[in-house]
Amino acid sequence: MSQDKAFTMEVRDDGVAVITIDVPGESMNTLKDSFAEEVGSLMNRLESDDSVKGVVFISGKPGSFIAGADINMIDGCENAVDAESLARKGQAMFDRIEQLNVPVVAAINGACLGGGLELAMACHVRVCTDNSKTALGLPEVKLGLLPGSGGTQRLPELVGVQQGLTMILTGKELRAKQALKAGLVTEVVPQSILLDVAVEHALKRKPKSTKPPLKGISKVLEATKFGRDIIFKKASEQAQKKAQGNYPAIDKIIQTVREGVERGREAGLDKEARSFGELAMTPESYQLRQIFFATTEMKKETGADGVKPDSVKRVGVLGGGLMGGGIAYVTAAKAGIPARIKDIAEDGIRHALHYSYERLDKKVKRRHMRRAELEKTMLMLSGSLDYSGFERTDVVIEAVFEDLNLKQKMVADVEEHADESTIFATNTSSLPITQIAAKAKRPEQVIGLHYFSPVDKMPLAEIITHPGTSDKTIATTVSLAKKQGKTPIVVKDGAGFYVNRILAPYMNEAARLLLAGEPIEHIDKTLVKFGFPVGPITLLDEVGIDVAAKVAPVLVKELGDRFEAPEAFEKLIDDDRKGKKNQKGFYQYGKSVKGKPVDTSVYSLLDIDPNESKSADEIIDICLLPMLNEAAYCLQEEIIRSPRDGDIGAIFGIGFPPFLGGPFRYMDSQGLETIVNKLEKLAAERGERYTPAPLLKQMLENGWNFYQ
């Protein structure tokens, strides 16, 4: 087979042309602009060769069909017309595949996403494997785009308008069995017979177009214009509830799908190409694409230049609580590494094992996993009340109480019972790693590995180094975090590390606004509208008011008075208000409570007469600017290694609005002069804690940006 081509064709003796997709020099297939010519020449051959009875598209990569289109193509577009032209080229290529006179089959194993699914949907039949890595979806919305090569038209035709809209608006992926049930694939088979079954389909008659397998209310709604109007209205409401009007792609997707449904595919494709071109030029899509590039770049990094990580074959976890259980779960279920849990009580071990079983069982029920895979994963988890089995661990992750003496004892215990090469990773959220490693025999093997709760859902991990941490320890810990499904950033030891340090002033200022009489809902709704997933007062309830109160003095001691927490925390703690964990905080909780109403008794407790006095813009500046300022301090003090790491940490760690690119890209887009002027104005009005970080002033004087 030719190694310089991505698409190669071989016609078998039975007359089936097998087209193998194998992009040279890449681990996964992605579609590039240049491939249109390759596919075009193959189509010329197929259109003129009467001996070909059928066609099969299959991947030459072991774990993926096509992971999507190469996003770099969009950055090469200078304007909306260029991007629109790119979409039309893709549409034309897939139209030719669909219009072939013989049956065309997509044989799918692994990721079939974006442009990959658009190619597969242009085929007449789709057969996929029951492999757990097989997933079909259109994730373009996550890049601020819509599918541009026919996806907005073909998906609703195959699975129905309701299901198609949901998939395109959320980027939701379907596993093999789900795709079969939805009508997206024709058959699900074991990987070993994928090609054989695909060839069988290619030798059958070209199938007639079928209607989506709709039942019940969905069938009734999609059959009439009135019903479809309800579907489009509901889809828009649900999507905008999350998007808050911050993602232009939402409206464009709904309009484009609707165009095709009401005026036919040709009109829909025209609208799709134009909308793709327009969205590609929006600042939101630009920022979302930069995040994609940053995370892709980070996947290739070890955290320590030129140092290869050691292999991690077994992990020990100290503590079977919420964090310990979550860490054990991602180690076994995502990394595929056996985890040994140690706790002082059998209940702790039982809790940790049950935590994993519950989540795996949910996957089985949703058809994301087979029962046999659940059992195999559970066999990777074991527990003990002592250190038996820890002598074979490569990394031990500690997730016990936030107590320095206890954590130092854990270091000593692990050094005694584990191998000399074992890494000790602490999941502390506030204690300095330098102090935890202070009495260690092998301090170079002590590192921070800070997960965020809930561990199985939050994508970030902070890898915290103290001055003595070895490069080998850093590289091995970064590698483990990636296998656990995390996006790790390496940060330097210091109070609050990075994420909690930039979060603290944001929440403190929200609390001060509340004490000044600003209603809780007004503060929270304003920042949700700005783009955060939850408001700062809700976040205080979720993090724990007691936790925030405990962390504040540590930050003040290490970093100064700008971290002083409002006195309100003491009153709240005295009233036993810890937040969501004990169902008593700023909001009401409990099964009988509908929605999420404010607990208005908190106003009288804090002697507040709530009244909206600040505008949305004022609330945003008061809460957000200290976070941006603190991010600049962290860069100045080399707590983070780069603006890129700071942006990824804020987006994945606290939900900083992704469409704004992160704190540093946001400051660049606003202009440092604007940021510094606003900080100086607030410093005069609200106190010295708003004084701009020296780095911001230096950069402004020199005319620099964070991203050149």
From Swiss-Prot:
Annotated region (Enoyl-CoA hydratase), positions in chain: 1-190
Reaction catalysis annotation: a (3S)-3-hydroxyacyl-CoA = a (2E)-enoyl-CoA + H2O; a 4-saturated-(3S)-3-hydroxyacyl-CoA = a (3E)-enoyl-CoA + H2O; a (3S)-3-hydroxyacyl-CoA + NAD(+) = a 3-oxoacyl-CoA + NADH + H(+); (3S)-3-hydroxybutanoyl-CoA = (3R)-3-hydroxybutanoyl-CoA
Key words, A-Z: Cytoplasm, Fatty acid metabolism, Isomerase, Lipid degradation, Lipid metabolism, Lyase, Multifunctional enzyme, NAD, Oxidoreductase
The protein's annotated pathway: Lipid metabolism; fatty acid beta-oxidation
InterPro entries per record: 3-OHacyl-CoA_DH_CS (IPR006180), 3-OHacyl-CoA_DH_NAD-bd (IPR006176), 3HC_DH_C (IPR006108), 6-PGluconate_DH-like_C_sf (IPR008927), ClpP/crotonase-like_dom_sf (IPR029045), Enoyl-CoA_hyd/isom_CS (IPR018376), Enoyl-CoA_hydra/iso (IPR001753), FA_oxidation_alpha_subunit (IPR050136)
SUPFAM superfamilies recorded: 6-phosphogluconate dehydrogenase C-terminal domain-like, ClpP/crotonase, NAD(P)-binding Rossmann-fold domains
Region (3-hydroxyacyl-CoA dehydrogenase): 310-708
Gene Ontology CC: cytoplasm
Site (Important for catalytic activity): E118, E140
Localisation: Cytoplasm
One BP term from GO: fatty acid beta-oxidation
EC number: 4.2.1.17, 5.1.2.3, 1.1.1.35
CDD domains referenced in this protein's UniProt entry, alphabetically: crotonase-like
Function: Catalyzes the formation of a hydroxyacyl-CoA by addition of water on enoyl-CoA. Also exhibits 3-hydroxyacyl-CoA epimerase and 3-hydroxyacyl-CoA dehydrogenase activities.
Family matches, as NCBIfam families: FadJ (TIGR02440), PRK11154.1 (NF008363)
Protein name per the record: Fatty acid oxidation complex subunit alpha
Species of provenance: Idiomarina loihiensis (strain ATCC BAA-735 / DSM 15497 / L2-TR)
Taxonomic lineage of the native organism: Bacteria, Pseudomonadati, Pseudomonadota, Gammaproteobacteria, Alteromonadales
Gene: fadJ
